[in-house]
Curated annotation (Swiss-Prot):
Stretch forming the signal peptide: none
InterPro entries: Late_L2
Name of this chain's protein: Minor capsid protein L2
UniProt source species: Human papillomavirus type 1 (Human papillomavirus type 1a)
Family designation: Belongs to the papillomaviridae L2 protein family.
Reported function: Minor protein of the capsid that localizes along the inner surface of the virion, within the central cavities beneath the L1 pentamers. Plays a role in capsid stabilization through interaction with the major capsid protein L1. Once the virion enters the host cell, L2 escorts the genomic DNA into the nucleus by promoting escape from the endosomal compartments and traffic through the host Golgi network.
GO molecular function annotation: DNA binding; structural molecule activity
Xref: Pfam families: Late_protein_L2 (PF00513)
Length: 507
């Protein structure tokens, strides 16, 4: 079985690591150190044969100084090399000799000590002109100090100047209603002593400030009505002229986008329902992101809206103003109509827009006033005052009750009497055509209840009456029947006592 030959690293990579441990293969060591058989032949042969200038063994390939010479031709060919740029030299400043100071010639025969010259006693005194201001005599007294011996006192003569005479006036007013108690421990800056000094400056008849008349405030219950007059039609300090309606120009380029107006209001909030059928388990945020539809072009599928056929991408909504001033919602769509063999989808780009309807003005609904009536209103207070507010009703139709003087009512007016309600009733029903139907309510037989029943009125008199009492026969009793009517259909529900009798054994 043949084994594949594994490639090893380059000799220049193997030699540095194996040289340290002295484990280099012979071929790699001879090649790197130039000790192969060919290298030795050149080394030994160069001792007897001069091959100067040919560049043999230098690995440069330049052919030496004369270059390569083809066979049978004269002259050499120089291999082109990279030219070396010539750089200008740095100018060197010339350094000259330093300045030469003259040195006096020393007389060798002269003395070693130089004698001083005698210039004489008359020196010229220069005259200096000084310009200074003359200051007046100071008022500070001059102090003359004299020398004293030890043990004697020093005497200073102080001269007094002309002191300025000053007048100090003092005025004191005693207030009998206020007395300041003088204490010994007065704090710093305390001026509340028994003497009070007022310093004032006369200002003449000049009045400082402005006399502003005050307006009386209305503290009553009246309402202060104020009106605001609008001076200008604009609401800001710098009015701006009416700007033309803004429309995104990049959407209305007919060379790039096809303009399609959508009439379905689902385009604003649910545009995905116009391309594919709704998925109730997925509700994306359509106001912030774009929509990408994964559809197979080979499989033909019907879309809910024909204008959105083959649409694979819808951008997020963009709002603008249409020429009429209404709000317009725009979306950019990309269609995938044609597909190449490589799988590239090609389609037109369409601008879908939907114009929102104008907001209709609010309908004015007439509201009924609350708390108003056309009757007479009586307002009474604890003080006995009675106020009447007259309405549309005549004064004779109302009864005025005075709260000042109490009125006594008779016992007959205060006695409670039983009024018979529900006797001889008839049910009248009117339909939409105006026909009247009258139903006679027949009295049903009422089974007497078990036990004693007393429906009469007993009046208790503490004093016994004389004579035989008169007993009036009882009036016929008619039961009260309640019938619930439905105004819309004219139907009614009978009382349970009027239902059809059934053969049922009573216990």
């Amino acid at each position: 079985m043949y084994r594949l030959r594994r490639k090893r690293a380059a000799p220049k990579d193997i030699y540095p690591s194996c040289k340290i441990s002295n484990t280099c293969p012979p071929d790699i060591q001879n090649k790197i150190e130039h000790t192969t058989i060919a290298d030795k032949i050149l080394q030994y042969g160069s001792l007897g044969v001069f091959l100067g200038g040919l560049g043999i063994g230098t690995a440069r390939g330049s052919g030496g100084r004369i270059g390569y010479t083809p066979l049978g031709e004269g002259g050499g060919v120089r291999v082109a090399t990279r030219p070396t740029p010539v750089r200008p030299t740095i100018p060197v400043e010339t350094v000259g000799p330093s300045e030469i100071f003259p040195i006096d010639v020393v007389d060798p025969t002269g003395p070693a000590v130089i004698p001083l010259q005698d210039l004489g006693r008359d020196f010229p005194i220069p005259t200096v002109q000084v310009i200074a201001e003359i200051h007046p005599i100071s008022d500070i007294p001059n102090i003359v100090a004299s020398s004293t011996n030890e043990g004697e006192s020093a005497i200073l003569d102080v001269l007094r100047g002309n002191a300025t005479i000053r007048t100090v006036s003092r005025t004191q007013y005693n207030n009998p209603s206020f007395t300041v108690a003088s204490t010994s421990n007065i704090s710093a800056g305390e001026a509340s002593t028994s003497d009070i000094v007022f310093v004032s400056n006369g200002s003449g008849d000049r009045v400082v400030g402005e006399d502003i008349p005050l307006v009386e405030l209305n503290l009553g219950l009246e309402t202060d009505t104020s009106s605001v007059v609008q001076e200008t039609a604009f609401s800001s300090s710098t009015p701006i002229a009416e700007r033309p309606s803004f429309r995104p120009s990049r959407f209305y380029n007919r060379r790039l986008y096809e303009q399609v107006q959508v009439q379905d209001p689902r385009f604003v909030e649910q545009p995905q329902s116009m391309v594919t059928f709704d998925n109730p388990a997925f509700e994306p945020e359509l106001d912030e992101v774009s929509i990408i539809f994964q559809r197979d072009l080979d499989a033909l599928a019907q879309t809910p809206v024909p204008e959105f056929r083959d649409v694979v991408y819808l951008s997020k909504p963009t709002f603008s103003r249409e020429p009429g001033g209404r709000l317009r919602v725009s979306r950019l769509g990309k269609s995938s109509t044609i597909r190449t063999r490589l799988g590239t989808a090609i389609g037109a780009r369409t601008h879908f827009f939907y114009d929102l309807s104008s907001i209709a003005p609010e309908d004015s609904i007439e509201l009924l006033p609350l708390g108003e009536h056309s009757q007479t209103t009586v307002i009474s207070s604890n003080l006995g005052d009675t106020a009447f507010i007259q309405g549309e009703t005549a004064e004779d139709d109302l009864e005025v009750i005075s709260l000042e003087t109490p009125q006594l009512y008779s016992e007959e007016e205060l006695l409670d009497t039983n009024e018979s309600v529900g006797e001889n009733l008839q049910l009248t029903i009117t339909n939409s055509e105006g026909e009247v139907s009258i139903l006679d309510l027949t009295q049903s037989r009422v089974r007497p209840p078990f036990g004693t029943e007393d429906t009469s009125l007993h009046v208790y008199y503490p004093n016994s009456s004389k004579g035989t009492p008169i007993i009036n026969p009882e009036e016929s009793f008619t039961p009260l029947v309640i019938i619930a009517l439905n105004n819309s259909t004219g139907d009614f529900e009978l009382h349970p006592s009027l239902r059809k009798r059934r053969k049922r054994a009573y216990v």
